[in-house]
């Protein structure tokens, strides 16, 4: 590769996916992530999902479906508390995500107002049972802007 980061960077989280097509579809419907790359070889399939506006500082979700693990079924890594967090723009957006998740049978935590700094949250389970938290007013974005500009 010709391009490399100027300094050490946090670049990805990797999760196993039992059915990579179903999992890519789930993440592109329920989160702001978009498919960046997809590969397949004899060892299995892989996909990178991320935010298209992060070209200069990418952070991606890596989904991997190893051929040798296909008969093992779901392998949730992020459960019951470990989770990926996504900050949304409004309380109503949390409610809408929870409504959609409930309709599809993947709502894990209903919308709940938690004490600071947690904020208003809900969580869904992805097709492999991993927890994805959606929060409003959690403050991660605000704190990063305050401290790092």
Residue ranges: model-predicted function:
Residues 24-25, 95, 132-133:
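Alpha-helical elements of the RecA-like P-loop NTPase motor core of helicases
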Residues 1-6, 9-19, 47-52, 72-149:
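Vicinal oxygen chelate
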Residues 7, 15-61, 65:
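Core segments of cupin and vicinal oxygen chelate
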Residues 64-70, 137-138:
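Acetyl-CoA-dependent GNAT
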